[in-house]
């Protein structure tokens, strides 16, 4: 499977992966890699830009919930529409779409019969919603910390200050998403961070955007026996397709 991104210098600052867990469903495999870092490494990462990678926040609220966003559009819908316009086959991609998007594609192809959509199940095991962490790619050499703050504001309409955030200073997570529909691997770095807001406060201040809607919160409980890796795995089980 081809890598969507090359290995950047960021790995020079991270020690060897401490542990790796693999989750797999019908559309994806996700490798969760735990990296041990320190405050110096974290500052170095935050002050550099890596446009080939995606950087995301795993936000933990004051009432101990992890904040997720629902995508308004599935990942591959634009690609499906483009392929239909070109008369190209895209059945595998259609299987990844929201049901409303599948219905729209059926209407687009009803006369041309470009894609054998009748074979696409309406009751498969993929989630009704596609959840993401706030985050995205650096704009050129934009520092990672600036990227995280900008993306959070763009995806939630909520501005944040660094003083409102408490990043985990010893761990960062790599989420390598192997997308079976397109045969590519997408590399994401996830930074656990505690935020000085409750889930109710985020919900009240959130405004739907072009790409995101429906702020969703995963209760992580009050047990101190759960490791941070356990929490990451719990949330990824909800996010994986």
Swiss-Prot record:
Keyword Nucleotide-binding: no
InterPro entries assigned to the protein according to its UniProt record, in alphabetical order: NUDIX_hydrolase-like_dom_sf, NUDIX_hydrolase_CS, NUDIX_hydrolase_dom
E.C. designation(s): 3.6.1.-
UniProt xrefs under PROSITE patterns: NUDIX, NUDIX_BOX
One of the record's GO molecular function terms: hydrolase activity
Motif Nudix box: chain residues: 136-157
Binding, Mg(2+): 151, 155, 204
Keyword Manganese listed: yes
Pfam families xrefs: NUDIX (PF00293)
Domain Nudix hydrolase residues, every copy: 50-241
Keywords of this entry: Hydrolase, Magnesium, Manganese, Metal-binding
Assigned protein family: Belongs to the Nudix hydrolase family.
Protein name: Putative hydrolase 080R
């Amino acid at each position: 499977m081809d890598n969507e991104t090359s290995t950047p210098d960021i790995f020079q600052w991270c020690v060897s992966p401490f542990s790796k867990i693999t989750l797999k469903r019908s559309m994806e495999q996700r490798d969760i890699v735990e990296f041990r870092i320190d405050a110096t490494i974290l500052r170095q990462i935050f002050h550099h830009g890596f446009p080939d990678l995606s950087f995301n926040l795993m936000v933990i609220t004051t009432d101990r919930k992890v904040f997720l966003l629902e995508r308004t559009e599935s990942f591959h819908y634009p690609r499906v529409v483009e392929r239909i316009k070109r008369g190209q086959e895209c059945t595998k991609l259609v299987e990844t779409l929201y049901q409303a998007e599948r219905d729209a594609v059926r209407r687009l192809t009803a006369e041309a019969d470009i894609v054998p959509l009748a074979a696409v199940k309406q009751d498969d095991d993929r989630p009704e919603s596609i959840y993401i962490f706030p985050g995205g790619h650096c704009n050129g050499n934009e520092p990672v910390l600036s990227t995280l703050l900008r993306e959070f504001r763009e995806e939630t309409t909520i501005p944040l200050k660094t003083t409102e955030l408490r990043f985990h200073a010893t761990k960062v997570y790599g989420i390598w998403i192997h997308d079976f529909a397109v045969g590519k691997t997408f590399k994401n770095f996830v930074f656990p961070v505690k935020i000085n807001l409750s889930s109710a406060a985020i919900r009240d201040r959130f405004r739907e955007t072009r790409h995101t809607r429906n702020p969703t919160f995963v209760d992580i409980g009050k047990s101190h026996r759960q490791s941070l890796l356990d929490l990451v795995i719990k949330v990824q089980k909800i996010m994986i397709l």
